Amino acid sequence: MSLQKCQEEWGELEKEFQQLQETHKVYKQKLEELSSLQNLCSSYINKHKRRLTELKGNLHGYKHTSNLEEKELIQQIDGTIKERHNAFFDMEAYLPKKNSLYLNLVLGNVNVTLLSKQTKFAYKDEYEKFKLYLTIILLLGAITCRFVLHYRVTDEVFNFLLVWYFCTLTIRESILISNGSRIKGWWVSHHYVSTFLSGVMLTWPDGLMYQMFRNQFLAFSIFQSCVQFLQYYYQSGCLYRLRALGERNHLHLTVEGFQSWMWRGLTFLLPVLFFGHFWQLYNAMTLFGLSRHEECKEWQVFVLALTFLLLFLGNFLTTLKVVHTKFQKNKLKKP
């Protein structure tokens, strides 16, 4: 390339750089405008929420003294207030907010709000794929430890993988909740309890008690991975249909249990889920029995027994509540 051409190239680059500087200046201005709008929206929402709470309290005071027409008006306003709170939830999904205590401990005070619907859905989709791939890896790991590699070292690798998997799930779920995902209740707590359980399993030293429970735990892990794979396969298809019909949010997640939206098309999974819940109870009873063994000296045995019992109670009662609520609704619909 001649010197003249190099000079021409440099001239073009200078023009492009100046244009880039102008574009970047506009970009920074828009960011400042966006930040101001976000603060303004958050302020309006908080103010509106406070006023709605006060209004709801005042209306509640009139319920017992109002006539029939006034009661209907109060009920109508109550229903609108609930709808308004749902609208606020959707709005806040696109606004920066304070992280939960857990996210603050893990990530610090970092803004995890994803601003576009496409970015949110891409993150949710990546979360679902992560669950699927790790479920398959954990299934293969449990089968290998149960039938091929009978070593404590390989068991520790498997248990460490479980700890990492559940820790990562809790972080990703917390980010999704901050971005408008409606996963809540026991199915959030479930992964924290599972993280603790896997951590205790990892610290359990090799010995007679460990070997007496090892095969049962690995068999349970194989079963659990198979159930999770089935749930992902059928729940993702069901959610796709419900989202297409507008009956579910685009950030709705697959879960390890049973929820009301699964009633149509996924009830065949209920017996499998209940079997898994009672297997957790069986694990708890086995460990309680081992804790009374004369050679049992490890604290992990009793702690694991309590943790499995907690998982059973949480899973079983939550699933039972969903089934009971659905039956009650079906009874009310019947003439």
UniProtKB/Swiss-Prot annotation:
Protein name: Transmembrane protein 120B-B
Family according to the record: Belongs to the TMEM120 family.
Keyword Lyase: no
Transmembrane parts of this sequence: 100-116, 130-150, 157-177, 193-213, 268-288, 300-320
Recorded topology in the membrane: Multi-pass membrane protein
Superkingdom to which the source organism belongs: Eukaryota
Record key words, sorted: Coiled coil, Membrane, Nucleus, Transmembrane, Transmembrane helix
Residues making up the signal peptide according to the UniProt record: none
Pfam family, one: TMEM120A-B
